[in-house]
């Protein structure tokens, strides 16, 4: 490509753009390259480096303490669950690094440590899984176990879970093969009875059977655009051996199974006295969960065996919900304050208002998930009105707004403040 046009103006030797069409044109021996082509080259090199790193498995694995510290920034409480998760994730990706680049150990075969999260709705299961993917900078996909069925039946194929991860990786197979998949509502696919079923259970035990292979590690043949498979189409092959699977559920009633096991150890009158005097809370009982309890709940033994790391999340109390409102980096109140700041308005919450939000969410029994719903309802009118008003500088939410649906207090700008803003706007437009 020529480096000059008919008028003698210099051009990029690669894309052909003139020097007036680009910000910079850098000269070399007989050639020129523009800033846009340099950026493109850097992007290509960076992508290639990332791909090589993914293939070699040389990415740095954070220490368990570092993973927990990162989780602390986004998830309130659940200390024991965070530790369990941090150790399991650290060991999983150490194993991934060891298996990559021909480092397989001849004498010791390291198996996968997929993770089971047990906890009530809104206790932070999904957020923990999402945050783990963020700290590791790996692709993340989420699926709902209740929508899954065995292949060939109406519903979503189990392999579509892996397809979601591939799509989240922009169809980069190497990236996808080191990603994280979270399957929610796993307790809803428990089999109907503790004994093996003689009839077809396509959305319960059948889904557990179908999940076994991808949990342990298999090569999944995925249709590029999703949907049902047909013989004529080409498939993308994804190896699930190094994908970390985190599954979670509320497991309502599991505490009763554990209580029955732990209290039946003593027989006769003493057992009744002990049961009435020392009944433990649901969260404490769940922390004593054993594989046999999960089997009685309805998970098949083979499925339980693929989930060696179990983390139990406690229900959130009022104080924990209060912390969730204000403490995390992405706290809900901070998100709303950011939204209001786009309109030049400062949003404030009184201490009593925050407590009222926590109490209302607690009554709804939806955990942290209920906090946003309470605030959305309480602030609907003010969020509707504020963009149409240019003279409001502050909005104060008190407990009456939350409990009684009262209007929040609005603080208006003075005439001097409005004039100063108008003058500042004129200066910016003239500049």
Curated annotation (Swiss-Prot):
GO MF annotations in UniProt: ATP binding; ATP hydrolysis activity; ATP-dependent protein folding chaperone; protein dimerization activity; unfolded protein binding; zinc ion binding
CDD domains: RecA-like_ClpX
Keywords: ATP-binding, Chaperone, Metal-binding, Nucleotide-binding, Zinc
Domain ClpX-type ZB: 1-53
Any one GO CC term of the record: HslUV protease complex
Residues that hold ATP according to the record: 120-127
PROSITE patterns: CLPX_ZB
Entries under SMART domains matching the protein: AAA, ClpB_D2-small, zf-C4_ClpX
Annotated positions binding Zn(2+): 12, 15, 34, 37
Entry superkingdom: Bacteria
BP GO terms, sorted: cell division; proteolysis involved in protein catabolic process
Stored HAMAP family: ClpX (MF_00175)
Role summary: ATP-dependent specificity component of the Clp protease. It directs the protease to specific substrates. Can perform chaperone functions in the absence of ClpP.
Family named by the database record: Belongs to the ClpX chaperone family.
Assembly description: Component of the ClpX-ClpP complex. Forms a hexameric ring that, in the presence of ATP, binds to fourteen ClpP subunits assembled into a disk-like structure with a central cavity, resembling the structure of eukaryotic proteasomes.
Name under which the protein is recorded: ATP-dependent Clp protease ATP-binding subunit ClpX
Organism ancestry: Bacteria, Pseudomonadati, Bdellovibrionota, Bdellovibrionia, Bdellovibrionales
Protein encoded by which gene: clpX
């Amino acid at each position: 490509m020529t480096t000059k046009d008919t008028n003698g103006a210099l051009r990029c030797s690669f894309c052909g753009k003139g020097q007036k069409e680009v910000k910079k044109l850098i000269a070399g021996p007989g050639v020129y390259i523009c800033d846009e082509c340099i950026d493109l080259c850097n992007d290509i090199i960076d992508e290639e480096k990332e791909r090589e790193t993914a293939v070699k498995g040389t990415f740095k694995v954070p220490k368990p303490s570092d993973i927990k510290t990162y989780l602390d920034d986004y998830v309130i409480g659940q200390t024991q669950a965070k530790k369990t998760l941090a150790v399991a994730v650290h060991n999983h990706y150490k194993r991934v690094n060891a298996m990559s680049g021909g480092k397989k150990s001849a004498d010791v075969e390291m198996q996968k440590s997929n993770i089971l999260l047990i906890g009530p709705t809104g206790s932070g299961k999904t957020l923990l899984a999402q945050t783990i993917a963020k700290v590791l900078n790996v692709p993340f996909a989420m699926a709902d176990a209740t929508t899954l069925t065995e292949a060939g039946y109406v519903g979503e194929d189990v392999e579509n879970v892996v397809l979601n991860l591939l799509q989240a990786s922009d169809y980069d197979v190497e990236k996808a093969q080191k990603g994280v998949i979270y399957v929610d509502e796993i307790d809803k696919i428990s089999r109907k009875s503790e004994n093996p079923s003689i009839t077809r259970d396509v959305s319960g035990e059948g889904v557990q059977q179908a999940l076994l292979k991808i949990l342990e590690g298999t090569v999944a043949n995925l249709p590029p655009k999703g949907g049902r498979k047909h013989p004529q189409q080409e498939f993308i092959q994804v190896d699930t051996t190094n994908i970390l699977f985190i599954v979670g559920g509320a497991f309502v009633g599991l505490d009763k199974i554990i209580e029955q096991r732990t209290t039946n150890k003593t027989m006769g009158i003493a057992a009744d006295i002990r049961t009435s005097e020392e009944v433990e809370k649901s969260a404490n009982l769940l922390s004593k969960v054993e594989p046999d309890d999960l089997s009685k709940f309805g998970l098949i033994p083979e499925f339980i065996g693929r989930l060696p790391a179990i983390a139990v999340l406690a229900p959130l109390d009022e104080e924990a919900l209060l912390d969730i409102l204000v403490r995390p980096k992405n706290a809900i109140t901070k998100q709303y304050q950011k939204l209001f700041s786009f309109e030049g308005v400062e949003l404030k919450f009184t201490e009593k208002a925050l407590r009222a939000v926590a109490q209302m969410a607690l009554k709804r029994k939806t955990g942290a998930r209920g906090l946003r719903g309470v605030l959305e309802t309480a602030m609907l009118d003010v969020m509707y009105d504020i963009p149409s008003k240019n003279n409001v500088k502050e909005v104060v939410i008190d407990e009456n707004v939350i409990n009684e649906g009262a209007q929040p207090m609005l603080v208006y700008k003075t005439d001097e403040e409005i004039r100063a803003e108008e003058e500042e706007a004129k200066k910016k437009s003239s500049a």
